[in-house]
Amino acid sequence: MKGGTSKFKTHTETLYKKKKWSSVSEKRPQKCPSQCLESKQPQVSVLGKRRRASQTPAQETLESEWPQKAKRKKRRREPQTPAQETLESEWPQKAKKKKRRGEPQTPTQESLESEQPPVSLLGKRRRESQTPAQENSESEQPRKAKRRRKKRKGSQQPTSSLLKTPETFLKAKKTTSAHKKKKNSVLEVDMETGIILVDKENMENLLETSRKDVDIVYVDMSKGQRSAKVRETGELPAAKPQEHGCRELLGDVRSRKKQKHLQKVAPWDVVQGSQPESISLPPSEPLSSEDLEGKSTEAAVFCKKKSKKNVFRSQELEPIPDSLDDSETISERLDSTHHGGAVGAGEECESTKESHSIKKKSKKKKHKSVALATSSDSASVTDSKAKNALVDSSEGSGAVREEDVDHRPAEAEAQACSTEKHREAMQRLEPTHEEESNSESASNSAARHISEDRRESDDSDVDLGSAVRQLREFIPDIQERAATTIRRMYRDDLGRFKEFKAQGVAIRFGKFSAKENKQIEKNVQDFLSLTGIESADKLLYTDRYPEEKTLITNLKRKHAFRLHIGKGIARPWKLVYYRAKKIFDVNNYKGRYNEEDTKKLKAYHSLHGNDWKKIGAMVARSSLSVALKFSQIGGTRNQGAWSKAETQRLIKAVEDVILKKMSPQELRELDSKLQEDPEGRLSIVREKLYKGISWVEVEARVETRNWMQCKSKWTEILTKRMTHGGFVYRGVNALQAKITLIERLYELNVNDANEIDWEDLASAIGDVPPPFVQAKFYKLKAACVPFWQKKTFPEIIDYLYKNSLPLLKEKLDKKMKKKDGQIQTPAAPKQDFLFKDIFHCDDDSDEGSPEEPSASDVQ
């Protein structure tokens, strides 16, 4: 019974083999002549001859003995794969265990051959190399297992398994026959190392049953399934029409490309429409003819004795050819390396050369257009940007991911050879059209960037003296500013300043008014609607959105953000920009600091120093807010009354800072005065005693007080010494000063506190500095006006005039009747003072300020 079964199987396989040879001979025109293939791959052809010589003649004698059973065998179409037969002959017990576990069986080689003609050649060679001893082992399998496999055939995923051990090859070499020779062998299998192709379902069981000297390759058969489905539906064209279609397609693409060059538009939809709709394959990168030759040699080298890890490592480490496009990934390179074993047709080489020449022409035209738009330096930048844009487009169009790459040997890739030819021919043309459109957009953007760069580089060519002379008309102290600031204002603000002068508007500095704040908000909203940027935070704090930073920056340059942000505001645009950042900063409105926030701020400052931007992001506040708060709480700062030593250090620090800030011309004037009158003393202009003082430097010199404490204490000392110890804000004089202040503010009829001339207002009270008057007005409105934070400046002044002013006058009349006191007449303000009158240290320096109003004065 066993002998009959073995004869039946041998006869069936031989009969099916003859039928396949006849079908393959009809499709033979699809491949290259055997001489061409043997000349390109000499090592593969020699190995093929050795394998064909190992076929046994015993199989031919059994062809005419079991004709009926052969027909049943065809209906079943269940021949065992070489891997299964070898496993069952060598490890019968383990093979039975696998069947009991219900491991999904692999599809037969005959069904794969019917769907994929290139793989059928390999299947025939494997079946012919089997000995009768291996076939006898198949008769021992029960028929129930075969029926079970027949039922499960429809639900199984197509996989191919192959196991060739050194023992099997030794047996095959002993029984050789030289009368059957095949000259068209393209792909060969490693004769020394066994390879198993498995999928994820039977991977675990094969790891248990496989030997140590067998390499296992994990295969993604999704590509095989797609090609098989296309073959069954009959939508894929035949080999000859496909070859002819590729040539026609290349000709159509050339003609369309010429038309699109005239229109300066290169859409991919036209080329995609000419492609057969049945082909839906992932895009592949263009390869030159040199790459195809290199990959054919790699397929021959792959047949040597190497482990799978070493093969992949060598492929990853080898340098990428220059002819490959930059957007080709490592996973696509591995996939194309396996395809290289099946590439060798003359038609494909011709189409590759033609498409490569088209790509070279497009690159030449691209370089010419870039060279006309920009200089030689900018051309390289444009090329890199165009390549980056091309990489993005290729990745977005569906590049092959690394986990989806089919890491199978060259012989398994032959099943999709014809499909890959058409796909590569089409996809080589796609980057050509994309490069044209990308080069145009890149050249335009590069021209804009270069114009901006040239505009910035022109700052160094600006004559500093000429810029100072022209800007001095609008900013008298422009020469005191840094050279870079002067050049920037000359470039960005001089034209705006001239327009405001023609309108009769003076250039402003200092605190922004409410009207200016509203104009800034309007300008920002208009620019957002113009550019389509989502929020003001993205516009003004672009660094917080690194993914959109380049796009937002380009939009700001394109639509002249500097002009839009400063529209209608007579200030330098940089100051307007800083004010807008403060207004629209979402972290700038967090309320007061609590104890926990203060502790965090100190801890972060100990770690990061004065990196206020980083610290502000960590505590969710603006950089200005954390810097200002730390200046108040940082270090060991004293509270309460000032000591005599602290007051003396403060006076000395202010004097040093003022002298340090003086210009050389002013110092020369002081020196000339000393030479004329050696016994005299140096004088100082009034404004220099309270304007332009760096309170941060003063704080560093005092060491025990923060800058706000230093500024407040200096205002008190300066007021006392400018009035020679007079009490301008005590008793009835304080009440009269408040009444005068409210009346003068009501007469000014201004809409914002920034519009007030505090110098003129201070003269109405006496010879006092403007900061003193500002401090008194703040205390007055805070004490008398309820909810003053929510009121506008005109509303505050109206409330003081209607409600507080009558009460203050009534109180002043009562005090005048009781004490019969006299009100001092305000002294005229001096324009300069002697240094000895201001910067002297006496015994009463440590006393508290006598100018502080009492509780009764505030009421």
Swiss-Prot record:
GO biological process, one term: termination of RNA polymerase I transcription
Domain (Myb-like): residue spans on this chain: 585-634, 634-718
Region (N-terminal region (NRD)), start-end ranges: 1-210
Signal peptide: none
Alphabetically ordered keywords of this record: DNA replication inhibitor, DNA-binding, Isopeptide bond, Nucleus, Phosphoprotein, Repeat, Transcription, Transcription regulation, Transcription termination, Ubl conjugation
Renumbered residue ranges of the record's region May be involved in interaction with ARF: 471-859
Keyword Ubl conjugation: yes
Keyword match GTP-binding: no
Compartments where found: Nucleus; Nucleus, Nucleolus; Nucleus, Nucleoplasm
Assembly behavior: Oligomer. The oligomeric structure enables to interact simultaneously with two separate DNA fragments. Interacts with BAZ2A/TIP5. Interacts with CAVIN1. Interacts (via the N-terminal region (NRD) and a C-terminal region) with CDKN2A/ARF; the interaction is direct. Interacts (via C-terminal region) with NPM1/B23.
Function: Multifunctional nucleolar protein that terminates ribosomal gene transcription, mediates replication fork arrest and regulates RNA polymerase I transcription on chromatin. Plays a dual role in rDNA regulation, being involved in both activation and silencing of rDNA transcription. Interaction with BAZ2A/TIP5 recovers DNA-binding activity.
Protein name: Transcription termination factor 1
Organism: Mus musculus (Mouse)
Gene name as annotated: Ttf1
